[in-house]
Amino acid sequence: MPQVIELEVRSYELDSYNHVNNAVYLNYLEYARMEFLKRIGFDYKGLIADGYMLYVTHIDIRYKYSARLHDKLNIEVSSLKLGKLSGTFRQIIKNSDGLICAEAEVSWGCVDTTGKPSKIPEQYLVPGLIPETEKQ
């Protein structure tokens, strides 16, 4: 089930064109993914303690509309795909008027402490990580 994470645009995130710099969206997406994982009950600290990590392997961002100072942004995060070693999140950033500022698909992989791809441990396959299409 999608989760919506809210944040407000801060002045230091603006570029010389007076809108959010494109690189800042990566920070927004990262923050929202970590909040998403917390909300769905994914124990990220436990995953690390057990010797695993989730690495971002690819990000595809489509910029649609400029976010500006003090805009209240809603970042919708959902799990799009889940395999044995990896998955993909879908993220949509909207302003308070509902206009889409950016859309992203973020692919990630599970690795062990040596950085080698690893199967996602069963205890971390919480319901929110499983895409809605796979639950049917």
PLM segments and residue spans:
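Short, surface-exposed acidic-centric catalytic microdomains
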Residues: 39-43
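Catalytic strand-loop segment that frames the active site of acyl-thioester-processing enzymes
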Residues: 1-36
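Short, basic/aromatic beta-hairpin or loop at an interaction surface
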Residues: 47-54
